[in-house]
């Protein structure tokens, strides 16, 4: 009988002993699961942050490329707009010399023929310059504009003249579209 009681006690304690480890195992599993979940959530948050950073960098790079493209196109348009500016500046003295040659009075037939040829060259050169957007700056009788005119001399205002008016052009000025190649050298009434 004592043996039976002992066995019975062992049976009763055994299930109690078995129950205790199951609770610990469940708790451990739950803790491990919670740790893994929090680690995964942290990893997901980190990956989301990295993705947001990459997206931001990508958008900034794309915007920078667009800005560079716009700047390049603008510079290219400026270059094309003012293409030939240096050539035009070097041709202007030739045009001045042709005008001086045309200002000379001739009396004989040979001189008149020569002057006619010079006039044709002058007209052709002016037309070619105009075709490329190079025009003479209007100055005589105009109000003095320091962006277009260079005053080399001033004279007192005479009757019928307005102050700050160009009364004489010493050397013609030229502009390429809206850019001044050479200001007109003028005499201004003051």
Swiss-Prot record:
Family (UniProt): Belongs to the GrpE family.
Region entry Disordered, spans: 1-41
Chief place of localization: cytoplasm
UniProt xrefs under HAMAP family: GrpE
NCBIfam families for the chain: PRK14140.1, PRK14162.1
Keyword Cytoplasm included in the entry's annotation: yes
PROSITE patterns: GRPE
Keyword S-adenosyl-L-methionine: no
Name used for this protein in its record: Protein GrpE
GO biological process terms, semicolon-separated: protein folding
